[in-house]
């Protein structure tokens, strides 16, 4: 048993030591102290997944390596503790030991007491399978991994590799797979994140060759390397496996040489095999001996190797001049000022000018570079080229030895600029232009081209881009070089969607721009890459949608070679919730045939190097494409050269026509030679287009993607518009729908088409017909009839232009008839709308003969003062007076020249054609929230919703749909959303564990041996001082090591990898280095990290605890926030300072308590059983009698014992405010109580507001309480009884009479209906005629044959149901007078009927005798029936 206890104690100490010294990363759901904050989830759908098999990670290291690795990371336990653990495992506790369900990895061990893995410092997870802290590696070689399997969501891990100063270290990335653009591994050449950044790895980086020669490798020269990994809350992948070595040749000599020690130093270097050169033997050298002696000669001193003879070129001088096939070459340069991305380049003569770009470090930065394309060398430039602040994502355009640079993101501030600067090539100087009208968007990720229009004007067209204030821009901005003015063009054709990082080229033959791809937002919360291809005609300002490439990408490049647009590289990652293998960095090579509207995929470069990249530049010189720089986790400085095949290399028509893809050649029959697309005649070009048109294949499924008439009819896929949807041209519209096949036939300015193209609130608000819907984060069209028929919504006003001829006063009266007034054109929107409408009305056929000069609400008030109808003064900015205007004769204003915005002063009584009316709109435009880019603090950025994201290290707030566009190169190390913000700097973290979660922070422990310390920005060597820009004197200040902030001589201790063992937060001394001896200062806990019961505060790092402030209604409160756990039901508030008025509690808890108001003659039940009720020990009630002449009875019972006190006062305020309560009852430890309060004893009549107070206390949770107050009469009130009795009796009688009357009416109605049915039934009986022979005494006996004096026969026999009875009817002769005549007024005959039995009746047979006279034959004597 002793061994078991010792083992348990040792285990507890080990766990405590691990907890105290570890620096685990923040995890999902973890709650930090108030002084810290955790990251938030990224918006959007997320799902966990595994990488496809083709991306399976490399094999794990041998079993010995993890063991050695864990030994390097973990301090060995003391021998006594190790012995105790061994005794515990092998002793009697072994019978109760639990085995872990899964094996522990990375040095973790199974705790036999809990069956869970105990992880070493830096590892987390059920199996210790995830990294989650900081590691320090000191071996001369080793590996870095996030652990087996997929890495953990929302994690931060840091590795410090420590070597010898200035010793070269190489990191080799054998396997790497993270979420592109979101999960990054940063590599610093030093011992902190303040050291130079040399790589930011993200995405899928898998060697593409069996020889593993293209695996990324990073070289560190300082002797230290810091690797920091951050993953967000989206999906996770297999992570990484990185090996490092201090004595290793670069890239293992690429497998083409041997690694040998250098003679001059202890370093190693490659001894390359034949035909290979370079530091890592990765440059082909004199392949095929350069074709000597026919094609070239090998030059051993030249790194390129071959010196080709005339008419030969390419690798090994194997390709003739002109080239009959395309080929790639690569030029590598090591100058530190060269690597960059998102720069721009133009060609002037034979010089490629490279301007701007993003760089990791700016110590050797150069704003402008010049590259000689002939000699392929970088040229020196004057220092004046660096006078401009560094930027990236800008645009460049060349015109007459001047380079125009517009927009871009300023790297030092993170702001997007709208500066327009010109670089003069001849003197290498910059000039800032100040355009007259600053009506342009500040954009980044756009493109620009300077073109000469058909009118002769030279303009710079700026295409798309992203603006932090207005989102993704879909318009074309135009800068007039001669007028020095900006304007936003109103384009025609398809409604295109603008984006960030597209490519664009200008084709001089077609006078059009071709724009491909980009990162686009289709609404505020829907964003992705695009594969669209647009054509923009610069003269007609017409957009056309061409065939898409089916290859989604952004930050790629494009050039035009002989009628073909070549597209190279880019970021192709388009996954948001799971990985489909799309790579961050691409070397895809595609060609688009302009004449045939056809895409082709070209072979990727075969250069023995990983040439995948994005953010590079590409220019064209002598039909050769030069690709420079870019980003592939590293910033690149090489130049890729693509030489395309030449048309004039083909000698036959068949070879000429078959050339490509990647080039368009035409056969000239007159000269019998092959010419390029640029030299073709118009007839040859049209012939080629017609041939392509006949062979084209249409993708009818693409028609469904167009949601507006303009895009449906302005594309090359043969679609037509059917009322509200787009269908292929071979599909007919349904009945009743109108087919529109041409763009010109589409209804113009329909807001239903273009509003949903706007991706931000501000861009939506610019259009008066659109409205931003904040809930769905989308722009919608306003209803068409919001202003009424004939009226148009412009801003917050409704405008209407009439054509009636009338004077000013009559025009004003006509407007008033519509609750309007003459328009005050005081805004740009109103002016542009009125002028546009006037031009349309004037150009229409119905009004071609009528000249409109409409009245506007502008009048002269005095000699020189003009003002609008809304009393605002007239300014000459939006509308101008015509020459020699205003004249003295006119006092009212008219629009005379809509094309020139001209005004005239006219005589008010003269009738003129037209007037402009204005009235307020019923619609009020919703105000947009502050744009994310203008929010300067994290709390402001993340407070409202998930539309903004805060980047903590960059101190920037960006739109959620623009995160990738804002930080394309991993600049943001951690982001936050939805009201989760970190401290502004390291000093805001109160504990060592939280401090070391931040990669730029370290912990300085004071000498008190209590665990108290402070979090400071620092490195492994010690604290650093963060300089301000003003004191540093440059744009990019660097932190400096400052050991005085944590002096070891003063017994301060600096911790950067692990926290100190003593973590008592300054409230206790440590014994055995890690155990808190006795927590003082009202603290408790293993590390004295919480306040004792009844006190609250943050005692971490020396914080204070203070008593709970509960106004006497609680003794306990939340130890962190101080929120009181109120003990009286009905009292609420953080300090128990309020009553639950909404639940019928009243009172003043600051001076007394709260009472529940009871109603008389009602029973109340209170069930205090919820978790929120666990702290209640008391509840109070108050009741006031309703009747002054009746006694008040009360009873109370409960499910548990309680104490009861009852008092009374003359009124409620008298009892609660002045304390005039009189005790009545005091009981303890009871479950039930009943009592009655006499109205005479307590004098209810003289105390009409008498109040009884009931105090129930000292009960335990849970409990159920029932209470009631009632007032009942003591004797019978006879008058009241009889009044009540007779009232009820008479009421009952009245009800009975009414019911009887209703019954009678119903019965009479039913009787009438029954009689009517009987009459109808009798009327519908069958009938027939009978012959009746009447005998008279005078008749001769021979007239009737036979004897008629027989038994009478019936005239009718009506059988009853069952045929056993019948109604028999016979004629009866009544008595007659003399002569056989009945008396006057009487009938001689009567019909008699009787009910007879016919069950025994025999049938009567009738026979006919031959002859003309019928006679009835004598029948056997039988009765026809018997009466019943």
Curated annotation (Swiss-Prot):
Residues 1062-1107, 1108-1156 form the Laminin EGF-like domain. Residues 794-918 form the C-type lectin domain. PROSITE patterns: C_TYPE_LECTIN_2, CUB, EGF_1, EGF_2, EGF_3, EGF_LAM_1, EGF_LAM_2. Residues 131-247 form the CUB domain. Residues 15-38 are annotated as: Disordered. Residues 83-1278 are extracellular. The keyword Cell membrane applies. The chain crosses the membrane at residues 1279-1299. Residues 23-82 form a propeptide. One of its GO terms (molecular function) is carbohydrate binding. Heavily glycosylated. CDD domains: CUB, EGF_Lam. The keyword S-adenosyl-L-methionine does not apply. PANTHER family: ATTRACTIN (PTHR46376:SF3), LEUCINE-ZIPPER-LIKE TRANSCRIPTIONAL REGULATOR 1 (PTHR46376). Monomer and homotrimer. This is Attractin. It comes from Mus musculus.
């Amino acid at each position: 048993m002793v061994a078991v206890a010792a083992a348990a104690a040792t285990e507890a100490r080990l766990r405590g030591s691990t907890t105290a010294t570890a620096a685990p990363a923040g995890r999902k759901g973890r709650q930090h102290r108030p002084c810290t904050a955790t990251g938030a989830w990224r918006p959007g759908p997320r799902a966990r997944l595994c990488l496809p098999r083709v991306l399976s990670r490399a094999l794990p290291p041998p079993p010995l390596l993890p063991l050695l690795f864990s030994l390097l990371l973990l301090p060995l336990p003391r021998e006594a503790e190790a012995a105790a653990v061994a005794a515990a495992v092998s002793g009697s506790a072994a019978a109760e030991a639990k085995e872990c369900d899964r094996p522990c990895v990375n040095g973790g061990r199974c705790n036999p007491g809990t069956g869970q893995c105990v992880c070493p410092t830096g590892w987390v997870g059920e199996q210790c399978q995830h990294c989650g802290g900081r590691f320090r590696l000191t071996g001369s070689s080793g590996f870095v991994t996030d652990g087996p399997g997929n890495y953990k969501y929302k994690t931060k891990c840091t590795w410090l590799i420590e070597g010898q100063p200035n010793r070269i270290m190489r990191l080799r990335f054998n396997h790497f797979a993270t979420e592109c653009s979101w999960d990054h591994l940063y590599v610093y050449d030093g011992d902190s994140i303040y050291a130079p950044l040399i790589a930011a790895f993200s995405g899928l980086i898998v060697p593409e060759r069996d020889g593993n020669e293209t695996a990324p490798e990073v070289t560190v020269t300082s002797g230290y390397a810091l690797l920091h990994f951050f993953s967000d809350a989206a999906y996770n992948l297999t992570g990484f496996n990185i090996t490092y070595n201090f004595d290793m040749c670069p890239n293992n000599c690429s497998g083409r040489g041997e690694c040998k020690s250098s003679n001059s130093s202890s370093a190693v270097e490659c001894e390359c095999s034949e035909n290979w050169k370079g530091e890592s033997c990765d440059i082909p050298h004199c392949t095929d001996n350069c074709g000597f002696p026919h094609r070239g000669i090998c030059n051993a001193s030249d790194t390129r190797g071959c010196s080709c003879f005339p008419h030969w070129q390419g690798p090994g001088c194997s390709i003739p001049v002109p080239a009959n096939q395309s080929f790639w070459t690569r030029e590598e340069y090591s100058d530190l000022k060269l690597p960059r991305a998102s720069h721009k380049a133009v060609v002037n003569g034979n010089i490629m000018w490279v301007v701007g770009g993003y760089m990791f470090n700016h110590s050797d930065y150069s704003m402008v570079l010049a590259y000689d394309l002939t000699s392929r060398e970088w040229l020196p430039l004057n220092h004046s080229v660096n006078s401009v602040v560094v930027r990236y994502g800008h645009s460049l355009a060349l015109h007459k030895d001047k380079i125009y640079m517009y927009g871009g993101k300023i790297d030092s501030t993170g702001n997007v600029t709208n500066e327009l600067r010109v670089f003069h090539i001849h003197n290498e100087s910059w000039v800032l232009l100040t355009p007259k009208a600053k009506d342009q968007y500040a954009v980044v990720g756009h493109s620009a081209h300077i073109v000469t229009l058909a009118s002769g004007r030279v303009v710079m067209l700026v295409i798309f881009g992203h603006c932090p204030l207005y989102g993704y821009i879909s318009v074309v901005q135009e800068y007039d070089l001669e007028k020095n003015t900006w304007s936003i063009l109103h384009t025609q054709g398809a409604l295109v969607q603008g984006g960030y990082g597209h490519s664009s080229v200008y084709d001089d033959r077609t006078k059009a721009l071709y724009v491909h791809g980009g990162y686009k937002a289709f609404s505020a919360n829907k964003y992705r890459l695009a594969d669209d291809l647009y054509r923009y005609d610069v003269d007609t300002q017409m957009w056309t949608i061409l065939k898409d490439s089916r290859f989604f990408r952004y930050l790629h490049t494009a050039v035009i070679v002989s009628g073909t647009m070549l597209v190279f590289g880019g970021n192709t990652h388009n996954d948001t919730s799971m990985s489909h293998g799309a790579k961050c960095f691409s070397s895809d090579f595609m060609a688009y045939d302009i004449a045939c509207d056809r895409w082709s995929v070209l072979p990727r470069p075969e250069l023995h190097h990983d040439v995948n990249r994005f953010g590079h530049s590409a220019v064209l010189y002598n039909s050769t494409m030069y690709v420079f720089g870019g980003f592939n986790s590293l910033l690149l400085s090489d130049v890729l050269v693509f030489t395309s095949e030449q048309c004039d290399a083909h000698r036959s028509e068949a070879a000429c026509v078959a050339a490509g893809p990647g080039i368009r050649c035409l056969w000239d029959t007159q000269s019998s030679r092959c010419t390029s697309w640029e030299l073709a005649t118009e007839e040859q070009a049209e012939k080629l287009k017609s041939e392509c048109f006949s062979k084209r294949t249409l993708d009818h499924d693409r028609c469904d993607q167009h949601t507006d008439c303009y895009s449906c009819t302005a594309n090359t896929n043969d679609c037509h518009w059917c009322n509200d949807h787009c269908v292929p041209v071979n599909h007919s519209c349904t009945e009743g729908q109108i087919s529109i096949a041409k763009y010109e036939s589409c209804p113009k300015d329909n807001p239903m088409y273009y509003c949903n193209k706007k991706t931000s609130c501000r861009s939506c608000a610019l259009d008066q017909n659109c409205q931003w819907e904040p809930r769905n984060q989308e722009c919608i069209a306003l209803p068409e009839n919001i202003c009424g028929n004939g009226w148009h919504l412009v801003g917050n006003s409704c405008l209407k232009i009439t054509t009636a001829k009338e004077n000013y006063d009559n025009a004003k009266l006509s407007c008033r008839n519509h609750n309007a007034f003459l328009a005050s054109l005081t805004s740009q929107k109103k002016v542009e709308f009125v002028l546009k409408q006037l031009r349309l009305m004037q150009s229409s056929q119905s009004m071609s003969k009528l000249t409109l000069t409409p009245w506007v609400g502008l009048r002269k008030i005095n000699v020189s003062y003009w003002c609008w109808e809304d009393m605002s003064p007239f300014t000459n900015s939006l509308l101008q007076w015509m020459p020699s205007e205003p004249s003295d004769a006119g006092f009212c204003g008219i629009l005379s020249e809509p094309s020139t915005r001209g005004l005239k002063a006219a005589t008010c009584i003269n009738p003129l054609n037209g007037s402009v009316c204005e009235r307020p709109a019923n619609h009020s435009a919703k105000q947009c929230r502050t744009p994310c880019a203008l929010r300067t603090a994290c709390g402001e950025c993340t407070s409202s919703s998930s539309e903004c994201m805060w980047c903590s290290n960059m101190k920037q707030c960006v739109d959620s749909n623009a995160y990738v566009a804002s930080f394309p190169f991993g600049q943001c190390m951690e982001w936050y959303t939805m009201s989760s913000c970190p401290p502004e700097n390291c000093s805001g973290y109160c504990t060592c564990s939280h401090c070391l979660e931040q990669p730029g922070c370290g912990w300085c422990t004071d000498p008190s041996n209590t665990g108290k310390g402070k979090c400071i920005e620092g490195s492994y060597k010690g604290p650093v001082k963060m300089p301000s820009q003003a004191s540093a004197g440059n744009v990019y200040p660097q932190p400096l090591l400052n050991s005085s902030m944590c002096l070891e001589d003063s017994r301060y201790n600096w911790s950067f990898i692990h926290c100190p063992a003593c973590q008592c937060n300054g409230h206790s001394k440590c014994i055995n280095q890690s155990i808190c001896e006795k927590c003082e200062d009202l603290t408790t806990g293993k590390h004295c990290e919480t306040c004792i019961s009844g006190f609250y505060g943050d005692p971490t790092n020396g914080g204070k605890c203070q008593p709970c402030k509960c106004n006497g209604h609680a003794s306990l409160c939340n130890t962190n926030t101080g929120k009181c756990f109120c003990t009286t039901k009905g009292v609420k508030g953080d300090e128990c300072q309020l009553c639950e008025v909404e639940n019928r509690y009243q009172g003043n808890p600051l001076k007394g308590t709260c009472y529940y108001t009871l109603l008389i003659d009602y029973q109340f039940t209170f069930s205090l059983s919820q978790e929120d009720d666990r702290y209640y020990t008391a509840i109070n009630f108050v009741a006031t009698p309703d009747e002054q002449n009746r006694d008040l009875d009360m009873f109370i019972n409960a499910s548990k014992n309680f104490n009861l006190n009852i008092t009374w006062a003359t009124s409620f305020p008298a009892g609660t405010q002045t304390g005039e309560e009189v005790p009545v009852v005091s009981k303890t430890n009871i479950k039930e109580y009943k009592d009655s309060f006499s109205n005479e004893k307590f004098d209810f009549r003289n105390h009409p507001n008498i109040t009884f107070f009931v105090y129930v206390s000292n009960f335990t949770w849970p409990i159920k309480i029932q209470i009631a107050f009632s007032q009942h009469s003591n004797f019978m009130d006879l008058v009241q009884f009889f009044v009540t009795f007779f009232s009820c009796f008479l009421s009952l009688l009245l009800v009975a009479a009414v019911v009887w009357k209703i019954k009678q009416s119903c019965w009479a109605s039913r009787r009438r209906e029954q009689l009517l049915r009987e009459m109808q039934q009798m009327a519908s009986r069958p009938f027939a005629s009978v012959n009746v022979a009447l005998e008279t005494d005078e008749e001769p006996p021979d007239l009737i044959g036979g004897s008629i004096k027989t038994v009478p026969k019936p005239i009718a026999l009506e059988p009853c149901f069952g045929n056993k009875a019948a109604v028999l009817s016979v004629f009866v002769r009544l008595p007659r007078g003399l002569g056989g005549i009945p008396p006057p007024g009487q009938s001689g005959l009567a019909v008699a009927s009787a009910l007879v039995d016919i069950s025994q009746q025999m049938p009567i047979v009738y026979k006919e005798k031959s002859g003309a006279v019928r006679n009835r034959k004598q029948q056997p004597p039988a009765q026809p029936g018997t009466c019943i």
